[in-house]
A protein has these predicted regions:
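Assembly/oligomerization scaffold segments
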Residues: 1-118, 169-176
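Charged- and aromatic-enriched interaction segments used to assemble
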Residues: 101-181
Length: 181
């Protein structure tokens, strides 16, 4: 995650886009919207944005396409999954307030499909037979960089009834003494 700051140490404005779940871009969301981004290391980041129905007296043409399960792309930050959309209309101002979480929130909706046992953390030559390969085989996530010190480590797990995200962030990080980003 690269951050851009100006000469005065202030964060530069983000370019914000609404996308379909397949990451196809729909429109820009920068015009007259208030937004708040909470970036977190090794945890889900959070993004809130308010999207007005009218912008400069004109109907925002993509207003009705802002829906739960769509994605928001913030340049140089990443994708966020829209989890909540609340529409308010007080007779004067109609708007949608959107809550989105960084894309790893997808893993919080997937149940873990592993049996109790001993697992090798990772092997770049036989990925599908490792813990990381088995966990990520049911998702669109790909393995980036893994420190070679972790490749040949084995750990035994009593697999809990949890989501993929909970298992990775709690059991895997603690057992292998690593940080997943």
């Amino acid at each position: 995650m690269l951050q851009k700051f100006n000469y005065f140490g202030e964060h530069e404005n983000y370019v914000i886009r609404l996308c379909n779940p397949n990451k196809e871009q729909i429109c820009f969301l920068n015009q007259s919207h208030t937004h708040e981004l909470s970036l977190r290391f090794n945890e889900m980041s959070e993004f809130h944005i308010t999207i007005p129905y009218l912008i400069d007296g004109e109907v925002f043409p993509y207003y009705d396409r802002v829906l739960s399960k769509k994605l928001i792309l913030i340049d140089d930050i990443g994708y966020f999954l829209i989890t909540e959309v609340n529409e308010t209309d007080d007779g004067i101002v109609k708007q949608k307030t959107v809550t989105a979480y960084s894309l790893e929130t997808e893993l919080a909706f997937k149940k873990l499909n592993l049996f109790d046992g001993t697992y090798k953390f990772y092997d770049p030559f036989n990925v599908e037979n490792t813990l990381m390969g088995k966990i990520l085989s049911t998702s669109n996530w790909k393995i980036g960089q893994i420190d070679a010190d972790l490749w040949n480590l084995y750990r035994t797990f009593e697999i809990p009834d949890s989501t993929v995200y909970e298992f990775l962030m709690n059991d895997v990080e603690n057992s292998y003494e690593c940080v997943l980003l």
